[in-house]
UniProtKB/Swiss-Prot annotation:
Source species taxonomy: Eukaryota, Viridiplantae, Streptophyta, Embryophyta, Tracheophyta
Record-linked InterPro entries: Homeodomain-like_sf, Myb_dom, Myb_TF_plants, SANT/Myb
Location within or outside the cell: Nucleus
GO cellular component terms, semicolon-separated: nucleus
PANTHER family documented for this protein: MYB FAMILY TRANSCRIPTION FACTOR, MYB-RELATED PROTEIN ZM1
UniProt DNA-binding region: 39-63, 91-114
Organism for this UniProt entry: Zea mays (Maize)
Protein name (record): Myb-related protein Zm1
Function: Transcription factor that positively regulates genes involved in anthocyanin biosynthesis such as A1.
Keywords assigned: Activator, DNA-binding, Nucleus, Repeat, Transcription, Transcription regulation
Domain HTH myb-type: 11-63, 64-118
Low complexity compositional bias, start-end: 133-166
PROSITE patterns according to UniProt: HTH_MYB
Primary site of residence: nucleus
Amino acid sequence: MGRGRAPCCAKVGLNRGSWTPQEDMRLIAYIQKHGHTNWRALPKQAGLLRCGKSCRLRWINYLRPDLKRGNFTDEEEEAIIRLHGLLGNKWSKIAACLPGRTDNEIKNVWNTHLKKKVAQREKKKAGAGSGDAGTPATAPLSSATSSTTTHNSSGGSDSGDQCGTSREPDATDVCTLQPEDMDVSDMLVDGAPPAAQPMPSPSSSSSLTTCVGGVEELIELPVIDIEPEIWSIIDGESAVARHGGDAAAPCTGTGTAVSTSEAEEAAANDWWLENLEKELGLWGYAEEDTQAHPDLLDHYTGLSPLCALEGDPVSTYFQTGPAAAEPELLVVVEPSAVLL
């Protein structure tokens, strides 16, 4: 095993305990004259019955001229607290940062006074931190509500002051067209077809939206209600056109058109009844029909009902019967003519 550290000086008969004033004067005189380069050799060279460690501690802690006496100032205490937080219990390094103060007295003041002071500060910070942890949840809400109310109030005032200026670009003008006075007969007369217009491109078409001075205007077309009488007039004109009438002729009156259409429907019904009577062998106009509608036969049959029967494809589908039921000839066979 190694020798390790040298044994203590007490084993060779050196002095122990407190220093006497004569020993202090010898140590001070030697260090001022030769310095303290080697603390192990210093006691023998100075003529002291002390070990090197005892001489060093006596010089550093009590005898050096720059040593400060008295209590620590507030600045020194704050410096010790800060350095202890950085370096820990390395008292020699802390003492090197505080001139005039020894590591021993710094350790003593820390253990007796500053340690309790730091503990109280940490408790206060912990209490303040717990209180602040509960308040931020409500503080942002209150600030947010206050900012919201302020923003709303300012927005309301701004909107009230600028209601005529800031919102004008968003508003759209709606133009309504007044319906022009026109005659019903002008609507029924077929006008000249409009000239062919080129197909509008998608980029140029605005679909009833025009931009005038940067403001969009929507044109609302009026809704024209067409009365039922007008539709009846249009239906009557189309029926007359199908039967050879002039489609371009203007309507002279509502009553005349309605009566003409009713007469045409009645004539068509009579014609189908005649076909049914002809199928059943009851063909022939009654005297009331010929007297009531003398022009019906001339319009549909020409000279006679037989001519109409030959010209009508529907009538020729049915088998034609005799014009009048002729009496059948009955042959009476006498009993004498019977063959034996």
